[in-house]
């Protein structure tokens, strides 16, 4: 954030800082101290598309934050944008369901949900 602050002091336009913001407290700190005018949370949102809602409800960090594996970027040219880090999910099916959840209606038939045993 030191570099973002130096840039902000040198230019007369808004500065957006990137660099792995995943916690509400760090985002608030950067904005409150005037380090930058905004932050980019792209990968954090890809990993947890409800991150801002979690922050609004008082959570500082998502339960399974982005691991910075970059699999989202590696898959983006041929597959839907989403988190492909299987270790963040209980199963591959859960991962695929989250990735495909942006499509409404789903592009292919979904299996019927059964109650957990």
Predicted regions and their residues:
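Flavin-dependent oxidoreductase catalytic cores
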Residues: 1-117
